[in-house]
Amino acid sequence: MDIFNNNKFYEGYEGETEVIFQILGDNNTSIHLWNGYIDDIMNHQPGTEDDFKNGLSRDWNTLEGPYSDENNNVIDIDDYYNDLLRFAGVKFKYEETKEVYDLVMYFLKQAKENNQEVEVIVD
């Protein structure tokens, strides 16, 4: 999977909300995503409200972390990865969302294996 300045899942959505996962201090190792794909993932959350207290689910639902106005963009990779594991096997609205999900999981796994920090920017 290509994680070198990958814009594939934002092309055609310029001007709409963009979510960028990037290695802290390395703008070239990044994936740029249309927020609609993230919304699609989050709109298919399995479980109960108690399951929304971690990772991307928490930040998306409560407008914390990258979704806040405070620019708190460095994420806990394990927190995000483990939260997103709950979505494995979910059928999403958009066909491309599964590819986005797989790409985000791959990106987080690679960052963890390489002891890198990840920041998420919602713009």
What does each model-identified segment do?
Residues 1-106, 110-114, 123:
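Acidic (Asp/Glu-rich) sequence patches and key acidic residues
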